[in-house]
Amino acid sequence: MISEFSYLNITSIGRNLIQEENDCGYACLEIPSCFSYNVAAFPDVNGKLLCELLPSDKYNNSDTFNASQEFHHFYIPVSQTTYLSQLFHWKDNK
C-alpha cells in the first residue's frame, strides 16, 4: 500500500537509487527485516529515485510518520502477495 506524500522517519537498513518505485519494493522483499520503505516522490537530476528500506512500519512508529513533499511511504498491508498486487495496480493507474 502507499501513503502518498508521507515519510516514516526512522533509521533505514538500506538506501539505493532506483529507476522505478517498484524496484524499491523488490529490494524490500529480498530482506527479511524490511517491513516498509520510503521512495522519493520525484527523480533527481539523473532521473533516479531515492529508496530507503525500513526495519519497521508506520503502525509501530506512528510518532515518526509525517507528511512530506518529497517522499511516498509504502508498507505491507496484509501479505506480500496482496502487497505486490496493490503495488502493480497503483503503478498501472498512475
Place the predicted regions along the sequence by residue.
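Extracellular disulfide-rich cysteine clusters
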Residues: 1-94
